[in-house]
């Protein structure tokens, strides 16, 4: 009887213990990359810049060659710009444009970086003879930033008319509306 009671109590203890199958943790680099990017953004809000830079670098390493990587590199570049390292930011913005060249914000950030570095005129000379529509975007932005607003607006407007089906065209048109409203 004592054995029966001991076995019965053991069975009750096992069934009532709430035992469940152990949770399997799977590593998903893409999700982890977004997590680290979001942590970096939170560090930026808290003005903890070194930690933000490290989080963005981790996000880039976890997801090295995707469209999301362009976002991470842009965030890293904006952080470098904010703390006063435009040369490091330039590399990040150029990499972001190479990975995903259809985000107008990346071009604006790179143009601002060129202005900070003081190489706007040399970049305009380099881009003047290019036939690439993406180089025309950069040229128009640099012209506007250098003070030749009319020339830059014409360059970007011509691009919008020549390439109406580009995904970036609506963002360029919106930017042109904002620039012409200030004049």
Language-model segments: residues:
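Short coil turns that delineate tetratricopeptide repeat
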Residues: 30, 64-67, 101, 130, ...
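Terminal, low-structured helical/coil segments at or just beyond the last alpha-helical repeat
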Residues: 129-183
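TPR alpha-solenoid repeat register
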Residues: 35, 69-72, 106, 135, ...
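Register position in tetratricopeptide repeats
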Residues: 45-46, 79-82, 116-117, 145, ...
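Hydrophobic/aromatic packing residues within the alpha-helices of TPR/SEL1-like helical repeat arrays
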Residues: 56, 93, 125-127, 156
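Canonical tetratricopeptide repeat
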Residues: 38, 72-75, 109, 138, ...
């Amino acid at each position: 009887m004592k054995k029966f009671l001991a076995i019965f109590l053991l069975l009750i203890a096992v069934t009532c213990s709430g035992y469940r199958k152990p949770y399997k943790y799977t590593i998903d680099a893409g999700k982890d990359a977004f997590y680290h990017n979001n942590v970096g953004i939170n560090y930026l809000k808290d003005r903890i810049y070194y930690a933000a830079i490290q989080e963005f670098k981790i996000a880039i390493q976890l997801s090295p060659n995707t469209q999301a990587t362009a976002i991470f590199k842009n965030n890293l570049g904006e952080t470098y710009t904010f703390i006063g390292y435009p040369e490091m930011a330039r590399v990040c913005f150029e990499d972001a444009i190479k990975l995903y060249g259809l985000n107008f914000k990346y071009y604006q950030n790179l143009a601002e970086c060129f202005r900070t570095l003081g190489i706007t005129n040399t970049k305009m000379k380099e881009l003047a003879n290019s036939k690439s529509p993406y180089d025309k975007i950069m040229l128009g932005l640099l012209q506007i930033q250098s003070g030749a607003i009319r020339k830059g607006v014409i360059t970007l407007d011509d691009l919008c008319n020549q390439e109406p089906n580009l995904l970036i065209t609506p963002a360029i048109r919106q930017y042109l509306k904002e620039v012409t409203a200030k004049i």
